Design a protein with these regions (language model features):
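Second-shell loop/turn segments in exported
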Residues: 2-6, 37-45, 66-70, 120-124, ...
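Hinge/cleft segment of the Venus flytrap/periplasmic-binding protein
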Residues: 3-4, 8, 19-23, 30-32, ...
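Short, solvent-exposed amphipathic alpha-helices that sit
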Residues: 8-34, 50-54, 81-85
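Hydrophobic alpha-helical segments within soluble ligand-binding/sensing domains
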Residues: 11, 15, 49-55, 106-110, ...
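Structured segments of extracytoplasmic/periplasmic soluble domains
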Residues: 19-26, 54-64, 85-89, 113, ...
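Hydrophobic alpha-helical
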Residues: 37-39, 43-113
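Extracellular/periplasmic ligand-binding modules, especially the Venus flytrap/periplasmic-binding
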Residues: 70, 74-86, 114-115, 121, ...
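Flexible, solvent-exposed loop/hinge segments that line or gate ligand/substrate-binding clefts
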Residues: 105-106, 122-125, 171
Length: 193
């Protein structure tokens, strides 16, 4: 029984749709391609050109008579590939506007795409703060102190809860990119031109 339960937990952990499942069940959100399992939606090496080819195939197979409303991308490099596929399929015109395309990591190309009104947003995690937190944890471990954590319950690996130190991510879009990314010194105005 414990083994079956463990497999069920692992299977549940790899379902991409868990937070979205109520919306899918009510048909408020429809994944036209039917691809919702992690193994179906994973992009090898997070590669933009691979994501572009995959999106081109999805558009050709599942969206000939319907339009795409949103693409939830886990990484900005993938978002750029998705946008290239959408644009080559005619999206981005007044008769066929670009869908909402999200991303993560506030990469330069995606921030420029946000400024241009293409990508809708990106999730920004300041690597300077991440590096500082990691460095502090390493120092604590090297000096025999327990590393500082601020979350002991959320992250589970199938066996136990894994303590973590979480930093607050920031959603960046056209309305706040300058304040979040330029004022903080992450990018300069010249880099974003």
């Amino acid at each position: 029984m414990a083994t079956q339960r463990h497999h069920r937990l692992r299977a549940r952990a790899v379902r991409l749709t868990d937070p979205l499942q109520p919306y899918l069940d009510k048909k408020q959100l429809v994944v036209q391609s039917g691809q919702t399992e992690l193994k179906q939606v994973t992009t090898l090496r997070w590669d933009g050109p691979t994501a572009q080819k995959r999106m081109e195939a999805i558009l050709a197979e599942s969206y000939r008579s319907k339009s795409v409303d949103a693409v939830l991308s886990p990484y900005d490099g993938i978002s750029i590939g998705v946008l290239a596929a959408l644009k080559s399929d005619g999206y981005g015109s007044s008769s066929k506007p670009l869908p909402v395309v999200t991303g993560q990591d506030a990469e330069l190309a995606s921030v420029k795409s946000i400024i241009a009104g293409e990508q809708a947003q990106t999730v920004y995690k300041d690597f300077r703060l991440l590096g500082e937190a990691a460095s502090d944890m390493i120092d604590d471990i090297r000096n025999g102190r327990p590393p500082k954590v601020n979350n002991r319950r959320t992250y589970k690996n199938g066996v136990k809860a894994v303590p973590a130190y979480l930093l607050e991510p920031t959603s960046v879009d056209k309305s706040n990119y300058e304040y979040v990314l330029v004022v903080s010194g992450y990018y300069t105005n010249a880099e974003l031109k």
